Amino acid sequence: MEIFPIPAESYTLGFIGAGKMAESIARGAVRSGVLPPSRIRTAVHFNLARRGAFESFGVTVLPSNDDVVRESDVVVLSVKPQLVKDVVSKLTPLLTKHKLLVSVAAGTKLKDLQEWAGNDRFIRVMPNTPAAVGQAASVMSLGGSATEEDGNIIAQLFGSIGKIWKAEEKYFDAITGLSGSGPAYVYLAIEALADGGVAAGLPRDLSLSLASQTVLGAASMVSQTGKHPGQLKDDVTSPGGTTITGIHELENGGFRGTLMNAVVAAAKRSRELS
């Protein structure tokens, strides 16, 4: 079957599923100017709060998922993994190769999505929760009939909520363990830093503010300077000083190995669940 190009300058975007991730993507697209809200639609069946969230920035809320697919050139599946097969199977007659299909459902492989949809013009994307503040780390993998132009459209769309990379799907379990679950590891680290500040005598609100800004600043140093984190660490570590003393304690506690083990364990669990 002939693959029809998606009109990059005028395509319509539909979300199957109206949860927080779909909202984050839609808001990012509107905020960045990638798409006007008039070209975005979703369906909300019962939850009035979700309907209100989308309508608050101009997205069209339609009566059914069927309507969303009919009116959309690009269809994003943003439903819980256990519901994907049922949802896709019901929409199969409408999922022609005129449509570019995108899945953000965790753990659902392209081969299954393509089989259920009867369409291999699919792109799988793994975003993470900082999409809500425009700082997602997303990775995409293209299915059998997805074109380079399709990939460019999705890269621009997900670029509106952070940064996006392309990778083979075989890496997605490891990506889940790192960037998918990673925000929770960092939240734990921020909480621990703040608790350490309190233990050292700081007021709780000041300690938490300093901890979160310190992590944000350190991450920005890595991404913006291009320096290896080990070099940046060495740059602020003086002989016999406070920082090397703190690092010594972290090394004694197995800090590096514990973080590495967390990523590996989460990746293993992702493989078990997919």
UniProtKB/Swiss-Prot annotation:
Protein location: Cytoplasm
GO BP: L-proline biosynthetic process
Pfam families: F420_oxidored, P5CR_dimer
Broad class of enzyme this protein falls into: oxidoreductase
Top-level taxon in the UniProt lineage: Eukaryota
Pathway it works in: Amino-acid biosynthesis; L-proline biosynthesis; L-proline from L-glutamate 5-semialdehyde: step 1/1
The keyword Cell cycle appears for this protein: no
GO molecular function, one term: pyrroline-5-carboxylate reductase activity
Record GO cellular component, one term: cytoplasm
Stated family: Belongs to the pyrroline-5-carboxylate reductase family.
Protein name, per record: Pyrroline-5-carboxylate reductase
